Amino acid sequence: MLEAYRQHVAERAALGVPPKPLDDAQTADLVELLKNPPAGEEAFLVDLLENRVPAGVDQAAYVKAAFLAALAKGEATSPLISKERAVYLLGTMLGGYNVAPLVALLDDAELAELAAEALKKTLLVFDAFHDVADKAKAGNANAQAVMQSWADAEWFTTRPDVPSEIKLTVFKVTGETNTDDLSPAQDAWSRPDIPLHANAMLKNERDGINPEVPGEVGPLNQIKELIAKGNQVAYVGDVVGTGSSRKSATNSVLWFFGDDIPHIPNKKDGGYCLGSKIAPIFFNTMEDAGALPIEIDVANMNMGDEIVLKIDHAAAKVTASKDGAVIAEAELKTPVLLDEARAGGRINLIVGRGLTTKAREALGLPVSTLFRVPVQPAATGKGFTQAQKMVGRACGLPEGQGVLPGTYCEPKMTTVGSQDTTGPMTRDELKDLACLGFSADLVMQSFCHTAAYPKPVDVQMQHSLPDFIMNRGGVSLRPGDGIIHSWLNRMLLPDTVGTGGDSHTRFPIGISFPAGSGLVAFAAATGVMPLDMPESVLVKFKGKMQPGITLRDLVHAIPYYAIQAGDLTVEKKGKKNIFSGRILEIDLTEMETDLTVEQAFELSDASAERSAAGCSITLSEEKVAEYLRSNITMLKWMISEGYGDARTMARRVENMEKWLANPSLLKADADAEYTKVYEIDLADIKEPVLCCPNDPDDAKLLSDVQGVKIDEVFVGSCMTNIGHFRATGKLLEKVPGGVLSTRLWIAPPTRMDEHQLMEEGFYNIYGKAGARTEMPGCSLCMGNQARVAPNTTCVSTSTRNFPNRLGQGANVYLASAELASVAAVLGKLPTPEEYQQYAAQIDSMSADIYQYLSFDKMGEYTDAAANVDTKKIAAAQLT
């Protein structure tokens, strides 16, 4: 074991990273060596046990905790670890498998006091709290000491406070840093391996950044030189963290600029992140990780500068100085940030505060005044928006009451989603949280990002992750099933709240607040999520859509109109974005056509590109009911196909049927207040709207970019549904000579869409035209597997067009499937007139083309569903 491990250490050292944490087999071997240590290896073996084994409910932690417990009880011995040291080490394991042994040791005359000291700093005790409380009531003095310590929040007060003044060295990245810059999609396979993945941070050349190996390894030496100055290094940028929700971006930043966590391998917390604008999901993820994110003007901060950051704790104000002169001032988003940073992160603070509250209640003490409390906004006397009412219901407020912007709350998480490039990190976070069962009503795991072209590490993950999720009561999809959102949307309950480890978790019914994997794990484990309620921006569409205009054009009209109003800028320095961090609420009541839920998702999905915190949409009860009837059949079909967890799906079916028995939807009050209201008359949108290379905010009319030569076209992603692929097929029938001059990629969102398109003959059309058909899933959209050729010009229906996302050096226009298909046929962006000639053919067949999958009307699914008794399954206990 030692020889193999040392070889692994050498291999990792060559990559400039520490070894991986020990797994359960290695830990078991280590235990045997510790019982009878080889001469000369003593210190090394102890270091491995103390510092290289994961905590929580990792299987290696189980082996470690069992060994330490056996040492403490005298059931095992080691010449290197005393009983006392074993108890201390149990106290470093955060929670989970270490808790029961420590609680039991409270009755041990020899070790009880040490066990109490260990428990005082342990937050993740969950139901074991009652065991300690019972011992305290029975007169156990050490249990009483633990309860008093928890009540006094010694877990918090013994940690160092955020310094009032600190000297920082600036690591400045100019312009916009998106999460793909910090955690490149092509390296998604390595995300759970935090140190190795961090090597790819900022690997692409850009102004002021000097990667070691451009396109492969980031600016490691540049970072080392700044660290060598002796100050803590702060990550600084004009616009920081836009794009995906991946916590791996935060992990990479903290790996270089954060603080070691004692006894926890390959993870860090703490650190400082300064940005003129910090994207909301990234901001939250930094909070969760124990960093201090500060929105402050960074115009006068440059790479390598030494600045002094002064933090007025009482006023929650920040001052940055350079060479003795003040260069920027700001207020913290909330004073609670200081408590979060001190606690080691927002999740630690929430869990710890809850533990302190429970202990004080048990001891008959008043509520603690130790922690900073968010200032709750005063009632306005006005009504509530749709989103505010949804969150209000999830917080248990009286029906019709909402949560005002600026309010701190913890809404119930009814639905939680996880996908396969964040799922392995979520699994690690769930282990750290000592989670053995989900409290959220439905947690779903997909395999849409890695199924098509998996690496060996992906295949291993695809084999191990489903059972991990299902064993905790979650629902697991299968590789090849398709995109997370296209499935998760079909499991939603109207007017409920949820989250997901993907920034496009944007519910078309209800509302979701996407998050990094740490917060997603917390939401899944506890069933609630912390939220500082955002303000809302309202977009009202009214009138009739013009010929040839698609929903994707309405999606792009939102940034287009905001640019015209001066509320959104494409320039990153001094960036303006009215949607950033706010809820985008979309009112469709004055549109002539009722949108289906599938259509509505195109609008809600793209709120991610606006950097909005969430999105809600007004839909008709009729369309929502149609959708739920279809989804009930789909869920029953899934149960018949052997998907798990069957009990969770059956329970969701029961709740859908309850809604259908008494349908109602929350609506905004007439006097609800919004930060801004945009009214978009559909009569004014007469030509397609695209987003230009390489920024999803850079919305322009087709006439502004017509004639651009196109090399490749992608029709796919969560922004598409079956209607888009039928439209593409109909347009491909018009290809001159029968074969495209462009390279066309086709990737349906789900295997049900693929199957139906094959049944209808569209795959024959795609093949004749020379299109490349991909496995249902994300395909090109994230750019982590298949990619377009370098330096090509493309049209894509995908979500984002950040630099290098779809392909190295690619210039990508975002457009509707209809416009993308015309570009594929013509090999260029058409003129508006050319486009309308093709679009007219689609409009004449629209009733047939834009038919969505109604599973309750499809025999293959209804026959299977008829044999599923969800009431019986939902009532059964988990086995």
Give each language-model segment a name.
Residues 15-20, 43-59, 73, 80-95, ...:
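Structural detector for internal amphipathic alpha-helices that build alpha-solenoid repeat scaffolds
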Residues 2-31, 36, 337-350:
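Amphipathic alpha-helical packing elements
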Residues 36-40, 73-81, 105-112, 135-139:
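Short coil turns that connect the paired helices of HEAT/ARM alpha-solenoid repeats
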Residues 98, 114-879:
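Fe-S-dependent hydro-lyases/dehydratases of central metabolism
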Residues 5, 27, 41-42, 64, ...:
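Short amphipathic alpha-helical segments that mediate assembly, nucleic-acid/protein binding
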Residues 24-32, 55-74, 93-106, 125-136:
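Amphipathic alpha-helical scaffolding segments comprising HEAT/armadillo-like alpha-solenoid repeats
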Residues 31-48:
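Generic amphipathic, hydrophobic interface segment in small proteins and small subunits
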